[in-house]
């Protein structure tokens, strides 16, 4: 056996460079033949393994120390009464019971957030898809328009934009002043209980650039032959959109729907700035994350805030699971026979 191994090694290495040797050794591995091993090769493999773990170690330390560790600690705090000044006191499920039975502000924050998500997300995706389709049929100047529409999604969540938005929709702002020219006096949007949620939804829809770019990339991948075949069958624009564009774009729609839904549940900065941190008027901008922040950092009820955070995590996870389950009936991927 040793004679065979040494003869194989001599055949592989005779008069060849190290690159050729490695190439032939890989070919031997793929063919299933026994590859001669040497101490030098085993040592090199060990060095490569150590180097791989070395590159992985910084991320692993960061994940354990900054993500997994705090998450597990917050899970523990969710079952305690903790206010930063005293040691956590175990209370079991009291925080969760109190949340749903004794805290009307919490129920209101859930309702407001659901309205924001269920109304704002479809409108945002519809706007993104509509603009993406327009850009898909326009070649001249499409780069400029693509950048212009995408820019709000980069700056929309910033504090400065929220300040500008608040000024625009205030009582003496340009939006209200323009409406007054046409005889419509709303008295400002920021302090109006009926209009502040539509104003927040409008701010979210204005940031449709990110899903628009993803929709545009998906539209570019649809074969034109499908539209030509639909035209031969007598399909009009609406029929082509329904029977070709939507099915071929369904996986992209699902991706954007999932991403934007999760993102909508996390609205915080704009609500905080526009309401000056109060969640007003009458709690109508007291979104879930803003109320969580107020409970944790204003009222110092860290245990209660941790319980709220985990309810949100579980709710979003359940929603994502439902979306994945229901997607089997309407999302089509390449190669599907449905």
What spans do the regions from the language model cover?
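A structural signal for multi-pass alpha-helical bundles of membrane permease subunits
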Residues: 48-338
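Transmembrane alpha-helical segments of polytopic membrane transport and secretion proteins
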Residues: 1-56, 140-142, 323-338
């Amino acid at each position: 056996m040793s004679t065979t191994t040494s003869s194989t090694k001599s055949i592989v290495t005779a008069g060849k460079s190290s690159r050729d040797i490695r190439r032939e050794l890989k070919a031997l591995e793929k063919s299933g033949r026994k590859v001669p091993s040497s101490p030098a090769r085993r040592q090199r493999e060990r060095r490569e393994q150590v180097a791989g773990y070395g590159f992985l170690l910084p991320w692993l330390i960061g994940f354990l120390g900054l993500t997994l560790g705090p998450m597990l600690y917050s899970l523990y705090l969710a079952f305690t009464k903790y206010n930063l000044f005293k040691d956590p006191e175990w209370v079991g499920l009291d925080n969760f019971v109190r949340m749903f039975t004794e805290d009307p502000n919490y129920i209101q924050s859930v309702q407001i957030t659901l309205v924001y998500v269920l109304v704002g997300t479809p409108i945002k995706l519809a706007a993104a898809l509509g603009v993406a389709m327009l850009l898909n049929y326009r070649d001249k100047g499409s780069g400029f328009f693509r950048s212009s529409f995408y820019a709000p999604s980069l700056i929309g969540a910033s504090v400065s934009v929220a300040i500008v938005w608040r000024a625009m929709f205030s009582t003496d702002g340009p939006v209200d002043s323009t409406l007054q020219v046409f005889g419509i006096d709303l008295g400002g949007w920021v302090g109006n209980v009926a209009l502040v949620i539509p104003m927040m939804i409008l701010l979210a829809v204005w940031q449709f650039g990110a899903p628009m770019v993803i929709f545009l990339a998906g539209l570019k991948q649809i074969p034109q032959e499908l539209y030509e075949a639909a035209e031969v069958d007598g399909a009009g624009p609406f029929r082509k959109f329904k029977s070709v564009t939507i099915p071929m774009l369904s996986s992209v729609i699902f991706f954007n729907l999932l991403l934007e839904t999760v993102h909508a549940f996390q609205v915080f900065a704009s609500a905080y700035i526009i309401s000056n941190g109060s969640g007003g008027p009458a709690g109508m901008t007291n979104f879930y994350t803003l109320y969580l922040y107020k409970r944790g950092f204003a009222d110092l009820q860290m245990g209660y805030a941790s319980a709220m955070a985990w309810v949100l995590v579980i709710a979003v996870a359940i929603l994502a699971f439902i979306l994945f389950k229901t997607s089997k009936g309407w999302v089509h991927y390449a190669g599907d026979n449905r």
